[in-house]
Amino acid sequence: MQFKKSSIVSFLSLLGSLTKAAAEVRLVTMDGVVYSYQVVTSTIKPATTYVETIYYTTTYVEAVTLTNHAVTSTTRESVVTSTLSSTSLLPETTEESTQEDEQTTDFTSTTDVESTTDVTSTTAETATLEPTTSDETYTTELTPTTSVKTTLENDDSTSVITTKSTSKANTQSISRKTSTLTPTVTSETTESTSAETLSSTDKSTSTSSSSVLEPMVTNTDCQVVYEYTDDDEYYSTVEISGTESVDAATTYTKTRTVYATISS
């Protein structure tokens, strides 16, 4: 009698465990065949957009001769903006798996890659008139005039901005001096990423400025030319052989913003 009780208890326990397991598996019976379905979907980093804007702001002083032959000055700015926008769609993968009791497996994978780049550049220019030079030290008489020149040269590896301002009303003694200037560069980068807000922003700002007061003869790739007069007026240009070219009074600002969508 005790043997029968233990057998009944074991049978009931086995039946209960099988019922529980069947409920967890959630088998579907169709036409006498048992099917088990499993769908797995994953996304690998959606599209990322990069927007990069470069501003060249050149501030220069232009001499102005008034009607009473007095010479004064005015300040002007020349701004050149270059915007680079790049959108890249990284691969997006979706997996679907169907499994039957016959061990049949189907796998589907789709990948989309797209890249778009837009480049926009705008330039502001003014006219110029410069005096004739013939020697390293000389004397010349200039008619009261005002001249300003802003030139932008752009190719694959060099971008040059040259600004010139000269004006004299009397006989002046002008000497030309050549020295080398190394610009001071400061860089600041701020990065913020949040998986909960599904977005991240990466902004970096670098400012490059050069001083005309203390030239340093340390880098032959950066040439600065000064033309001094009795009133300490000067003409200076800084040319960097790399990817940047700025005037001595130019502020160079570069902003890079990254918009990224992060899937949870």
From Swiss-Prot:
Residues 93-104 have a biased composition (Acidic residues). One of its GO terms (cellular component) is extracellular region. Residues 1-23 form the signal peptide. Residues 248-264 form a propeptide. Involved in pseudohyphal growth, cell wall metabolism and required for the separation of the mother and daughter cells. The keyword Lipid metabolism does not apply. Residues 75-213 are annotated as: Disordered. GO terms for biological process: cell wall organization. Keywords: Cell wall, Cell wall biogenesis/degradation, Glycoprotein, GPI-anchor, Lipoprotein, Membrane, Secreted, Signal. A lipid is attached at D247 (GPI-anchor amidated aspartate). Residues 75-92, 105-147, 157-168, 178-211 have a biased composition (Low complexity). It is found in: Secreted, Cell wall; Membrane. The lineage of its organism: Eukaryota, Fungi, Dikarya, Ascomycota, Saccharomycotina. InterPro entries: DSE2. It comes from the Eukaryota. It comes from Kluyveromyces lactis (strain ATCC 8585 / CBS 2359 / DSM 70799 / NBRC 1267 / NRRL Y-1140 / WM37). This is Protein DSE2. Its main location: secreted. It is a lipid-anchor; GPI-anchor.
